[in-house]
């Protein structure tokens, strides 16, 4: 349990007065929670620590009893053995949070709850639901007078217990009724809760989806830095751990850098050798990174780094194919001693590459959310989102403070790279970034995330790209038309018109239309 100041203790005491009432017929639960896996149990304990009376329910009721007899014993936590009993113990408006497997189980529990709920009651889905499902539930429940909230919850089991990052969205009428609970139990960054209202319908789960996509990108970038140190620098795991420990004291200070340090320091107790080197090099995924990449394609936003992070996991899963290909496909390899003569410069370059690529990853993530806000009619608070991610979640980092500051100063900022801080940072990091990608290519080390981040940056800063030729090709084989470059108009190539040319004739035939291909 966290330490609280005197005012907080008085608040907790007042909240607990109803719990001390022995009359069981009085509805005294502040919030109900369905799903007693570790995340659910820890979030209940967190709420109880903050003075809230929580009613716990699980499909397997024996789990409720075990929880009450052990972790929840002596705390302001009540149990329920049925949905009706859960609802009956809650104050109005009833606030019920689901922490169950995404998909059909969420709909099943909602359907079980509905017969016992009244207009104005609140259902909160705190699982990893896909945002289109949250959009649907928001609409369906609104017709029944039930306020639906889809909330991203990040931070894992530890975060749920000590303070997660919470990203609620849905029916805004619910926010005044859940705001105090959510912001009390959420992680704090510089005294501010890592929780705020995100937006309508499925916006909360959308923001959590993008969070998870960025998480994929951050992890892949870290793995590529590790791979370069291991295979090109020939560093021992302890040395690499030392590098990450140093990086965690600077601009890269973050949860993922911190745990990477810990992993690299950990030795198998049976033989004293680094445990990480004994792990099969095939990475799993639950699909949220893929959701982000697919949505980026749907909205036409080049979220290339997250896409490559997803594909890298797919390639890692092709272990048998890679083993076979490693024997047949030729290319540069580093054998014997490391070709790196200046280790400090090599490490400094990698730090710059990691920092610059991280900036690109977040730039792309916020570009995607900006477009989603336009397409889906949401009002997203980018500064608030960055603040939510500063603590309690997997991608929490010092770096996010600068994003929060940028969007507070310029709420309508379209691209983080155009904000002075990030423009300056990526300019300074560019030399080491390019050197690291160059070494990876030279020595045959795959760095898809570093490389695509750099390609995106160079593409974005290019006033002219070769898409003119691409559009001509499309017009050649499919009559998809094109527009003429400003200043190149003539009697055949008319301004602001879509033009088709018969490319096979000498000089060609020209036609124009206002059709946008």
UniProtKB/Swiss-Prot annotation:
Entry-linked NCBIfam families: gnd (TIGR00873), PRK09287.1 (NF006765)
GO biological process: D-gluconate metabolic process; glycolytic process via Entner-Doudoroff Pathway; pentose-phosphate shunt, oxidative branch
Annotated metabolic or biological route of this protein: Carbohydrate degradation; pentose phosphate pathway; D-ribulose 5-phosphate from D-glucose 6-phosphate (oxidative stage): step 3/3
Catalytic activity, EC: 1.1.1.44
Keywords assigned: Gluconate utilization, NADP, Oxidoreductase, Pentose shunt
Family statement drawn from the similarity comment of this UniProt entry: Belongs to the 6-phosphogluconate dehydrogenase family.
Catalytic activity reported: 6-phospho-D-gluconate + NADP(+) = D-ribulose 5-phosphate + CO2 + NADPH
Coiled-coil parts of chain: none
Protein name: 6-phosphogluconate dehydrogenase, decarboxylating
